[in-house]
Amino acid sequence: DVVMTQTPLSLPVSLGDQASISCRSSQSLVHSNGNTYLNWYLQKAGQSPKLLIYKVSNRFSGVPDRFSGSGSGTDFTLKISRVEAEDLGIYFCSQTTHVPPTFGGGTKLEIKR
């Protein structure tokens, strides 16, 4: 199975800061059809994960443009340009290029104390 490694595990930020989360896969996520099926999700407390970004850099419907995804091959990044309170939670990367689909361990975005 493809191993997805996220860093950092915890990301303390102040509101208005930029946040950056990295995701690395154990093998290339470029599909034979040329697409790269790397997705980002946000799970808020008590809720199921919600899709933010699909195929590396495409924002899902309704996702604010302060969220952006980039990367290729095995290395990917999610950036939040100005963190808002509603952005707090656990972020996951996932790949659906290979079977079975696999997820990173999560990055908790929290307020810096």
UniProtKB/Swiss-Prot annotation:
Residues 40-54 are annotated as: Framework-2. InterPro entries: Ig-like_dom, Ig-like_dom_sf, Ig-like_fold, Ig_sub, Ig_V-set, IgV_Light_Chain. Residues 1-23 are annotated as: Framework-1. Residues 55-61 are annotated as: Complementarity-determining-2. Keywords: Adaptive immunity, Disulfide bond, Hybridoma, Immunity, Immunoglobulin, Monoclonal antibody. Residues 103-112 are annotated as: Framework-4. Residues 94-102 are annotated as: Complementarity-determining-3. Disulfide bonds join 23-93. It comes from the Eukaryota. Residues 24-39 are annotated as: Complementarity-determining-1. GO terms for biological process: adaptive immune response; immune response. Residues 62-93 are annotated as: Framework-3. Pfam families: V-set. GO terms for molecular function: antigen binding. GO terms for cellular component: immunoglobulin complex. This chain was isolated from an IgG2a hybridoma protein that binds digoxin. This is Ig kappa chain V-II region 26-10. It comes from Mus musculus (Mouse).
